[in-house]
UniProtKB/Swiss-Prot annotation:
EC class name: transferase
Record lineage: Bacteria, Bacillati, Actinomycetota, Actinomycetes, Kitasatosporales
Name of the gene encoding the protein in the UniProt record: aphD
Name listed for the protein in its UniProt record: Streptomycin 6-kinase
InterPro entries (alphabetical): Kinase-like_dom_sf (IPR011009), NH2Glyco/OHUrea_AB-resist_kin (IPR006748)
GO biological process per UniProt: response to antibiotic; secondary metabolic process
Length: 307
């Protein structure tokens, strides 16, 4: 790769790694241009457009030697990147961006190129967009679970055990009662955590337009568990748009009904595992120093409550 192709690391990505990764994160960012150059040379690639980034990864559009459009995804090696690689291999491109190659040492992935400028959020009809999500989830959940992924039982059990020491961090007694209630609901489900491969973060922004299919999922954080645990990102996605309707409860309930019917899920279990996501999110917020349950979390819980 020539000097004119030198990668400029986006400021947002550099700041994210500096904030969350400390010295190790800053060192990884400093070595990122050289890592891109090595991967381009190794796979005989050619740069093909400007880079994109999120909080954790850099995506570099490239062309393969045969002219095929692809994308390099670079992310600091972590447990999550290992899980993503396992999941991508298991799905084999079925409803998911296809893994073309990877570098195990650096966790760099060579992926098929999708249209990063067009996400599922661009679909104005919410029922239509939710139908796309449901179809993708159904395909992703149909793949047998590969070895090497964390199980939902372990994760959910740890959350329930954490509640007694975390709940007093919430200032409002009603919030403390909510958290205990969610934990009780999850405790009833821990013994049957499920055996499907879950995406964990499938929402409108993690579905991109593609060439071989209209839409494909990206950025999985796979684990093995009950499909009901995969619903919350879909229920919460585009929250500002939900609030703009003036009836968040109706929209969330409509989405829940559509998803559970399409995926043929037991509604009670799906609601319980969605409460597990609300519990998880709130415990993370408490770790970050927050003292109240986020209003959107409460709204989802109320929408799923029995009439």
């Amino acid at each position: 790769m020539s000097s004119s192709d030198h990668i400029h690391v986006p400021d947002g990505l550099a700041e994210s790694y500096s904030r969350s990764g400390g010295e190790e994160g800053r060192a990884w960012i400093a070595g990122l241009p050289a890592l891109v150059a090595r991967c381009v040379d190794r796979w005989e690639l050619k740069r093909d457009g400007g880079v994109r980034s999120g909080e954790a990864s850099l995506v570099v559009p490239v062309l393969r030697a045969d002219g095929t459009r692809a994308a390099l995804k670079l992310q600091m090696p972590r447990e999550e990147t290992t899980a993503a690689l396992i999941g991508l291999r298991a799905w084999g491109g079925d409803g998911m961006v296809r893994l073309l190659d990877h570098d195990e040492e650096s966790s760099t992935m060579l992926l098929e190129r999708l249209d990063g400028s067009r996400t599922l959020a661009s679909v104005e009809d919410d029922d239509e967009a939710m139908g796309v999500l449901a179809g993708l989830l159904n395909r992703l959940h149909s793949v047998p679970a590969p070895p090497g992924l964390r199980g939902l039982g372990e994760i959910a059990g740890a959350m329930v055990e954490e509640v007694p020491s975390a709940v007093d961090s919430l200032a409002d007694p009603e919030d403390r009662s909510r958290l205990r209630g969610w934990a009780s609901a999850v405790a009833e489900l821990v013994g049957e955590p499920g055996d499907r491969v879950l995406h964990w973060d499938l929402h409108y922004e993690n579905v991109l337009a593609a060439e071989r299919e209209p839409w494909l999922a990206i950025d999985p954080e796979p684990l093995v568990g009950d499909p009901g645990f995969d619903l919350w990102p879909a229920l919460d996605t585009g929250w500002e748009r939900i609030e703009a309707t003036g009836d968040a409860r109706r929209v969330v309930r409509r989405r829940f009904d559509l998803l559970t019917e399409s995926l043929e899920l037991d509604r009670g279990r799906a609601a319980g595992w969605t409460l597990a996501r609300l519990l998880q999110n709130t415990l993370w917020d408490i770790e970050d120093g927050l003292t109240a349950i986020a209003p959107s979390q409460i709204a989802v819980a109320e929408a799923l409550a029995k009439p």
